[in-house]
Amino acid sequence: MAAGVAAWLPFARAAAIGWMPVANCPMPLAPADKSKRQDELIVLNVSGRRFQTWRTTLERYPDTLLGSTEKEFFFNEDTKEYFFDRDPEVFRCVLNFYRTGKLHYPRYECISAYDDELAFYGILPEIIGDCCYEEYKDRKRENAERLMDDNDSENNQESMPSLSFRQTMWRAFENPHTSTLALVFYYVTGFFIAVSVITNVVETVPCGTVPGSKELPCGERYSVAFFCLDTACVMIFTVEYLLRLFAAPSRYRFIRSVMSIIDVVAIMPYYIGLVMTNNEDVSGAFVTLRVFRVFRIFKFSRHSQGLRILGYTLKSCASELGFLLFSLTMAIIIFATVMFYAEKGSSASKFTSIPASFWYTIVTMTTLGYGDMVPKTIAGKIFGSICSLSGVLVIALPVPVIVSNFSRIYHQNQRADKRRAQKKARLARIRVAKTGSSNAYLHSKRNGLLNEALELTGTPEEEHMGKTASLIESQHHHLLHCLEKTTGLSYLVDDPLLSVRTSTIKNHEFIDEQMFEQNCMESSMQNYPSTRSPSLSSHAGLTTTCCSRRSKKTTHLPNSNLPATRLRSMQELSTIHIQGSEQPSLTTSRSSLNLKADDGLRPNCKTSQITTAIISIPAPPALTPEGETRPPPASPGPNTNIPSIASNVVKVSVL
């Protein structure tokens, strides 16, 4: 009964406030959907991050990857998951698109990576929501401009070797930092532009009076000096214009360009003044032409990145500037008409016509207020106040857009310059790395270590020999010298670098193993005390200058009784067969292995080169419990195993 009351209580409350009537009988249970199964809750594993959603959620957009059957290719049978090796952060936005139907762009994501993820899942970026679409388009445009700049710089660098003379000259004009000569010409033209502008200003300054005449300007008092300065500047500008015209890729487009027109207007008054006579009728026209010399200041735009950015900003804000001009024109006409009719009844009014009222309207809307024209009537003052407030609103609205565009273009140029500098430094490092291969680097490093060791142990003559001799050959001959000192045998060189043939010596096996060159230096500076341990460093006839640290390694000494295949596998670079007089066999007594260091050969590093190597000796036969050695192996015969023969192989590795 209590359960029934609890079930009806929400409906009773709803009926009390008028939501729904109270039913006469209990509500039936909700029908179970047989088609809805638990396995419709699928798991999407994106780079280790698991996302769960309903299959019907993904099937809302069957044209995409997750909504089609193509996602079955990514199904993992072991984990029963769909695994995608993609960015999990972007996938969160993708999954929200399937859930809500709205695609958003996260501002912290890279635009290229975001586009790649959308392309992988088969989602068009045009369906991005209105709240994020403008941000997406701005980032897309900036990325496209950056890639275009990078491609242009790469194309310019790739086409540099095949540039013609004209192309090289034009590239020097457009980018003066390509060569020293172009940079010098760039600064020379900039200096003469500054001199020309200063001359045009200073020649109008009064420079005293002449007796019997009025005060003269400097241009007339020192006419020769100013003429020489003007001539020098015009000559430089003329040469620059002709060179640019010659090197231009398209001369027609160059002549039509704004900077070309400025160059012509800047130098034309000088040549017109040369051919113009002193006739008073044309002197006024000549003075008017001299005014155009002030346009030479626009030539600074080639030398100032800020001026160029300002030009690009005004060009990119053409629509905003057009809106500003159109709004001002409408407001000027409206308020000029209103002010004319408002001040028409005043006797001392200066608003004589609507065009005359334009001046007052322009000055008022731009918040200048010269005060030469002021309204007299109350209606004129009221409309004048409205005109002033309207001007503030009309002018202030497009200004933030222009400022933001200027900031965007400026920072874009800064980033482009920084990328070019970084790329130039990276290419320089790559060129330096390509000049020397890894073998050359290792060769020089090894020579440095060996020369350092020779400076401590060798004589000047030997150091000179070590520097002039070949590294590998010197190491090889040093190794032969060490073997001769150790075994008392002579060697016949079969190959000057790799292989040597001599007679056999039993129970010796030299194994190749790479060691550092400083091992020899350490061994030459150290005296080994006598010891009772069977160390190789104290054994007479077995110690060499290139194997003094063999006892410090943990590598097990191979046994001469191992199979021949094991012995052959230990050979790496070369095999030395030793031939000579009959040598006494090694004693099998453990006490005979412990000799004093003075009895053996002392380490000898007084050679032209030092070679580091590892010589491993087979372990002597084990002793019997009675202290006697086991009998030696039988002499070779028809039934002798291969290991007894293979034990006479000496293997040497030359570093």
UniProtKB/Swiss-Prot annotation:
Residues 472-487 are annotated as: Mediates dendritic targeting. CDD domains: BTB_POZ_KCND3. Residues 205-223, 278-283, 344-352 are extracellular. The modification Phosphoserine is found at S153, S569, S585. A motif (Selectivity filter) lies at residues 367-372. It holds the Pfam family Ion_trans. Residues 70-78 are annotated as: Interaction with KCNIP1. Detected in carotid body chemoreceptor cells and in frontal cortex. GO terms for molecular function: A-type (transient outward) potassium channel activity; metal ion binding. Residues 1-182, 247-253, 307-318, 401-655 are cytoplasmic. It catalyses: K(+)(in) = K(+)(out). Residues 353-366, 367-374 dip into the membrane without crossing it. Residues 618-644 are annotated as: Disordered. Keywords: Cell membrane, Cell projection, Ion channel, Ion transport, Membrane, Metal-binding, Phosphoprotein, Potassium, Potassium channel, Potassium transport, Transmembrane, Transmembrane helix, Transport, Voltage-gated channel, Zinc. It is a multi-pass membrane protein. K(+) binds at T367, L368, G369, Y370. One of its GO terms (biological process) is potassium ion transport. The chain crosses the membrane at residues 183-204, 224-246, 254-277, 284-306, 319-343, 378-400. It comes from the Eukaryota. Residues 6-21, 470-487 are annotated as: Interaction with KCNIP1 and KCNIP2. Homotetramer. Heterotetramer with KCND2. Associates with the regulatory subunits KCNIP3 and KCNIP4. Interacts with KCNE1, KCNE2, SCN1B and KCNAB1 and DLG1. Component of heteromultimeric potassium channels. Identified in potassium channel complexes containing KCND1, KCND2, KCND3, KCNIP1, KCNIP2, KCNIP3, KCNIP4, DPP6 and DPP10. This is A-type voltage-gated potassium channel KCND3. It comes from Oryctolagus cuniculus.
